[in-house]
Amino acid sequence: MELDAVSRSYKRWAIYDFSFGKVSESPRRRTAAHVNARGGRVLEVGVGTGLSLPLYSHRVAVTGIDFSHEMLARAREKVEEMGLEPVKELRQMDARELDFPDETFDTVVAMFLVSVVPEPERVVSEMARVCRKGGEVVIVNHFARDKGPLAAVEKALARFENTLGWHSDFAIERVTADPRLEVVEQTPMSPGGLFTFLRFQRR
């Protein structure tokens, strides 16, 4: 998927917070609770409009990045309006080229991102690079089913991925190959197992 297609699809979703917020609420809460329990420096890659930002506690110091200026503007409004002290910085950035030194963060999170960006393997590689050894990389996303009636539906929808901004047949293997990352948890999440909580330890 090309970056300009991603940007266009986000602009078309003027009601993004409302339409996607409810669907993603449970996975976001579960992920934020895990991150809060760990504490430390956190990078959220693809922070979007900041749907997850109110969920972070004072145990963490959060940096958020996104490619979309429009989404970041909305995220900044939320931080200011809600007084979100755990959020320390929001920056415009390409997730394939993160402008941070190696091993900067204790936890690196990407929610609902890897199937809607170009070169997701590069994104995961960068997430691994900026995560400290012994830290965690957490990816929450929809991954393709390999069997059952929904698998056929996902393959059919994949033809429209640039229009929808959603890659329905995205294979989990595309984010599990980095040798620096060891999968330590893979858990289906509501609604209906649509999303997967994928947790890695940084070697």
Curated annotation (Swiss-Prot):
It holds the Pfam family Methyltransf_11. One of its GO terms (molecular function) is phosphatidylethanolamine N-methyltransferase activity. Gene3D superfamilies: Vaccinia Virus protein VP39 (3.40.50.150). Pathway: Phospholipid metabolism; phosphatidylcholine biosynthesis. GO terms for biological process: methylation; phosphatidylcholine biosynthetic process. InterPro entries: Methyltransf_11, Methyltransf_Superfamily, SAM-dependent_MTases_sf. It comes from the Bacteria. PANTHER family: METHYLTRANSFERASE. It catalyses: a 1,2-diacyl-sn-glycero-3-phosphoethanolamine + S-adenosyl-L-methionine = a 1,2-diacyl-sn-glycero-3-phospho-N-methylethanolamine + S-adenosyl-L-homocysteine + H(+). This enzyme catalyzes three distinct methylation reactions for converting phosphatidylethanolamine to phosphatidylcholine. Keywords: Lipid biosynthesis, Lipid metabolism, Methyltransferase, Phospholipid biosynthesis, Phospholipid metabolism, S-adenosyl-L-methionine, Transferase. This is Phosphatidylethanolamine N-methyltransferase. It comes from Cereibacter sphaeroides. Its EC number is 2.1.1.17. It is an enzyme of class 2 (transferase). The lineage of its organism: Bacteria, Pseudomonadati, Pseudomonadota, Alphaproteobacteria, Rhodobacterales.
